[in-house]
């Protein structure tokens, strides 16, 4: 799926997946902690409070952390999270999605993260 070259445009829309609800991608923020904690727990992944805090309190000139949210059970739920260092040829170092709810979210989130890193490195070059 071709994605926009504007990093803002990547996060300003919702995405339809092969199955499941539409998802919205946005930069992670501290208020996402409960949702990220729940996502990791549901996937059986251990997380420390300091690790979670570091995940949502990142330096946006060096790192991107993106949350995927979807409307579930009457609320906006975190259904994915990914992170990448904003360096040339970087790949996501964190990528967790709820594949039971969102078929195809993993590749979409990975693509958006990689494009965000590439666009960022071109802008500062």
Task: Outline where the language-model segments fall.
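Short acidic N-proximal helix/loop "leader" segments that mark the beginning
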Residues: 1-20
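Short aromatic/hydrophobic contact patches that present stacked aromatics
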Residues: 22-24, 91-95, 125
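A short beta-loop-alpha structural element at the N-terminal edge
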Residues: 23-36
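Acetyl-CoA-dependent GNAT
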Residues: 46-93, 98-99
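Conserved acetyl-CoA-binding loop-helix of GNAT-fold acetyltransferases
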Residues: 102-117
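Conserved GNAT acetyl-CoA-binding A-motif
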Residues: 116-125
